[in-house]
Amino acid sequence: MACGSKRKTLIPEFDRGKEKWRLSMEHFFNTAPQAGEDKEEYISEPKSDKAPKGANPGLAYIFEHTNGRKCLIFTNSREECEAVCQNLLQYCEVNREPDRFLIHHGNLSASYRESAEDEMKDDESLVSICATATLELGIDIGRLERAFQIDAPFTVSGFLQRLGRTGRRGEPAQMWFVMREDHPEPRAIMPEMIPWYLIQGIALVQLYIEERFVEPPRL
């Protein structure tokens, strides 16, 4: 604003106080058995539904913790977004439940995206949207209870933007990570046995919490 003049520009600073987040990070193999199945499960919140038998473990977790809530389910690609939404809708059909999942990404028509946005703005509606970066910011979709993130987002800024869609109106921001990986082969070499998605998710959170690191904006 002071460009071309000798006037000083003052940037206002606001004390936002302490922020509270609620983060959860679960790791699933795409096929059974799961790690730690023989141990007592730690449950932070009771399930609100039951996924059909044979459901993908990671998607079953999302299905069982979105019923009766308004949530965003973030994916990292349009193809994955389509596949996730289709699977969740199939679980509704198998359980003979009303459809409670919508989809939102850049390849859909504007009218289709707007229809999903209008549904989310309705305070009486308890649907969830499977989305890509199109719903990271900028579009008002009302009050959300939580966001799910399938695998780790590509950047710290992406993580913060997606987390920031929740936690409004005095509630803590809430994100549940769902890391999904294939079982390593019995003779797999060490790098193939490492849960890279899980490590990437932990690293993204630590980079911001411990270093306050955020990628510089692209010019």
Protein language model features and the residues they cover:
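Conserved interdomain linker/interface between the two RecA-like ATPase lobes of SF2 helicase motors
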Residues: 1-78, 181-182, 197-210
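Conserved helicase motor "Helicase C" RecA-like lobe of SF1/SF2 P-loop NTPases
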Residues: 77-100
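Alpha-helical scaffold elements adjacent to nucleotide-binding pockets in ATP/GTP-utilizing enzyme cores
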Residues: 1-2, 83-88, 115-119, 140-146, ...
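Conserved RecA-like helicase motor-core motifs
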Residues: 7-14, 92-111
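Conserved nucleotide-binding/hydrolysis micro-motifs of P-loop NTPases
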Residues: 5, 16-20, 28-31, 78-81, ...
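Beta-edge loop/turn motif
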Residues: 76, 129-136, 143
